Amino acid sequence: MPPHPLRVAVVCSSNQNRSMEAHNILSKRGFDVRSFGTGTHVKLPGPAPDKPNIYDFKTTYEQMYNDLVRKDKELYTQNGILHMLDRNKRIKSRPERFQSCRDQFDLVITCEERVYDQVLEDLNSREQESFQPVHVINVDIQDNHEEATLGAFLICELCQCIQHTDDMENEMDELLQEFEEKSHRPFLHSVCFY
């Protein structure tokens, strides 16, 4: 088992749905967890697919919530966005961008391949300082409320298994292979260094 609790980052595009659902569940299970997005802006569904609500990462969840209540409370209640923002503001005040964070993690879990590529690109562009390894794992999760919940439990189970390995560096590939077979989902895995 690692000498300290596993430091985990969960990353999706906007730090709203998938990463926050996993953040919520991992936090309740006692993990040292943070969540992030990799997009240039935070996007939430709007009144039509081609009209998303776009916010800066500095915008708080509370401000987004109030803005959407003002725009169309019924629509955003019905589609679950207000409920999601209400959960988010109880976890932290605003979304965070992965590329702006300089904290070090043992494990970074992404929720889609495009985000995985952005995280790897960011980590590989940083100057190496501590040469501390970080495992980056992608778990593909569709961006809807139900899949976010199922994906969060899968991520939690994966983190619990990794937390209990004796030798994370040597057991990771075998562990991920077992998870792929069990969950019928492909996982991507890379190791980067801080």
UniProtKB/Swiss-Prot annotation:
Q: What class of enzyme is it?
A: hydrolase
Q: Where in the cell is it found?
A: Nucleus; Cytoplasm
Cite the Gene3D superfamilies for this sequence. Answer: 3.40.50.2300
Give GO terms for biological process. mRNA processing; termination of RNA polymerase II transcription
- Indicate yes or no for the key word Nucleotidyltransferase: no
Q: Where does the sequence pass through the membrane?
A: none
Catalytic activity reported: O-phospho-L-seryl-[protein] + H2O = L-seryl-[protein] + phosphate; O-phospho-L-threonyl-[protein] + H2O = L-threonyl-[protein] + phosphate
* Entry EC number(s): 3.1.3.16
Which InterPro entries would you find in this protein's record?
A: RNA_pol_II_suA
One Gene Ontology cellular component annotation held by this UniProt entry: mRNA cleavage and polyadenylation specificity factor complex
Keywords, alphabetical: Coiled coil, Cytoplasm, Hydrolase, mRNA processing, Nucleus, Protein phosphatase
Q: Its Gene Ontology molecular function terms?
A: RNA polymerase II CTD heptapeptide repeat phosphatase activity
- Coiled coil, from the record: 160-185
Stored Pfam families: Ssu72
UniProt lists the family membership as follows: Belongs to the SSU72 phosphatase family.
Output the PANTHER family linked to this UniProt entry. RNA POLYMERASE II SUBUNIT A C-TERMINAL DOMAIN PHOSPHATASE
What does it do? May be involved in the C-terminal domain of RNA polymerase II dephosphorylation, RNA processing and termination.
| Name by which UniProt lists this protein | RNA polymerase II subunit A C-terminal domain phosphatase SSU72
> What's the source species for this entry?
Danio rerio
Q: Which gene does this sequence derive from? A: ssu72
